[in-house]
């Protein structure tokens, strides 16, 4: 298989880095002083109370029975996987879907739930009227172990500008962030198409905008969903596995960037079309490599959620602030500059100034000798104030 489900243990390396990065952006200078005072402690207590209240609201949120689950051939396998979270005391799996228009986000929700709950636009003629659409389904299959578990899916509009087409819709992205503010996000599902050959500048701009809005740590709880994965024919010189691996490598490279930011970014291949092949043995929808994609997708989501101790909750302070992002480096940079100036630059400047002064003395002495040889008075050497005025006169000319 091109992308087999990854065990939850492989995500553990990112957990501590995720928490550290989120904490790094949480407190700006003013909040740091508040946290050291009684007022800051009270504010922190109020915020924690708000989080608890939000958790209770999420638990009481209206949900409908997951009727489409019984129509899915993969039902039993999906329930077994979801039961892993239920066994850990989790009552809900919340997934936020992000990506461009026409990559299959809404279709993926319909496929996952087994029912048409989200409107799908075949042709993108205008901007989405709804920025976010939330669907909550509750398991009710007569099994006490898993009944009551909720699956919450948050669909979002395309992140490209509907008018320009080649720029990021930052307004929509900000509205998405505000809509999910305070909502516990277990997994982010970043959707793109498999049947493309490159990551274009718009893709990179969208990825950067997501990082700036939600914080780079959001990618450590992201699963990449590549739709249109039923590729019957791949480009010449490639087979299915090599093409998938190449596409995955491009997307991961665009997200990870240079240096030390290396989120795992597991990948799930998706085929929402009704023409997707079906296994003659199990009845599961399978990809060209034989993988039952819906079961693999649910497994990736559960693995990612299980690897995180707490869900992600958006707050504006997590957004990238160029003036605050590396503020802790400012004292270090200033100290390094002062040390460099005192140890290296200042002695060399003083030495150079002394050489200039000695050269000027030598030139004026030589001029005096020449004028005495001619029987003239010694040259008039202007003082510093007169010399400065002469320089200004020449500069003005």
UniProtKB/Swiss-Prot annotation:
The gene is TOC34. GTP binds at residues 102-107, 121-126, 228, 271-272. Residues 271-273 are annotated as: G5. A motif (AKR2A-binding sequence (ABS) required for chloroplast outer envelope membrane targeting) lies at residues 350-358. This is Translocase of chloroplast 34 homolog, chloroplastic. Residues 126-130 are annotated as: G2. Keywords: Chloroplast, GTP-binding, Hydrolase, Magnesium, Membrane, Metal-binding, Nucleotide-binding, Plastid, Plastid outer membrane, Protein transport, Receptor, Transmembrane, Transmembrane helix, Transport. The chain crosses the membrane at residues 329-349. One of its GO terms (molecular function) is metal ion binding. It comes from Chlamydomonas reinhardtii (Chlamydomonas smithii). Mg(2+) binds at residue 106. GO terms for biological process: protein transport. Residues 99-106 are annotated as: G1.
């Amino acid at each position: 298989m091109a992308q087999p489900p990854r065990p939850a243990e492989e995500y553990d390396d990112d957990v501590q880095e995720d928490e550290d990065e989120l904490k790094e952006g949480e407190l700006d200078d003013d909040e740091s002083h508040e946290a050291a005072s009684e007022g800051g402690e009270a504010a922190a207590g109020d915020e924690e109370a708000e989080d608890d209240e939000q958790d209770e609201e999420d638990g009481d949120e209206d949900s409908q029975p997951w009727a489409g689950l019984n129509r899915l051939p993969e039902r039993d396998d999906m329930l077994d996987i979801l039961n892993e979270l239920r066994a850990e005391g989790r009552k809900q799996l919340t997934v936020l879907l992000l990506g461009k228009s026409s990559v299959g986000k809404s279709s993926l929700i319909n496929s996952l739930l087994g029912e048409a709950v989200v409107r799908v636009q075949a042709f993108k003629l205008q901007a989405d009227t709804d920025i976010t659409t939330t669907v909550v389904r509750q398991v009710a299959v007569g099994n006490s172990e898993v009944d009551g578990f909720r699956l919450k899916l948050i669909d979002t509009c395309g992140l490209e500008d509907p008018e320009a087409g080649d720029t990021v819709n930052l307004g929509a992205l900000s509205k998405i962030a505000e809509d999910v503010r305070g909502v516990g996000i277990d997994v982010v599902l970043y959707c793109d198409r498999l049947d493309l050959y490159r990551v274009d500048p718009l893709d990179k701009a969208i990825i950067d905008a997501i990082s700036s809005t939600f914080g780079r740590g959001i990618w450590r709880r992201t699963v990449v969903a590549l739709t249109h994965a039923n590729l019957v024919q791949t480009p010449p010189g490639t087979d299915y596995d090599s093409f998938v691996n190449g596409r995955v490598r491009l997307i991961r490279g665009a997200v990870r960037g240079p240096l030390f930011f290396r989120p795992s970014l597991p990948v799930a291949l998706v085929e929402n079309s009704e023409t997707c092949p079906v296994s003659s043995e199990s009845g599961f929808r399978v990809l060209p490599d034989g993988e039952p994609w819906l079961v693999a997708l649910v497994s990736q989501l559960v693995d990612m959620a299980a690897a995180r101790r707490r869900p992600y909750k958006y707050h504006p302070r997590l957004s990238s602030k160029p003036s605050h992002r590396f503020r802790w480096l400012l004292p270090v940079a200033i100290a390094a500059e002062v040390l460099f100036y005192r140890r290296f630059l200042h002695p060399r400047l003083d030495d150079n100034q002394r050489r200039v002064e000695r050269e000027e003395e030598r030139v004026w002495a030589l001029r005096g000798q020449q004028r005495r040889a001619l029987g003239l008075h010694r040259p008039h050497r202007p003082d510093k104030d007169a010399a400065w005025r002469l320089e200004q006169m020449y500069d003005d000319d």
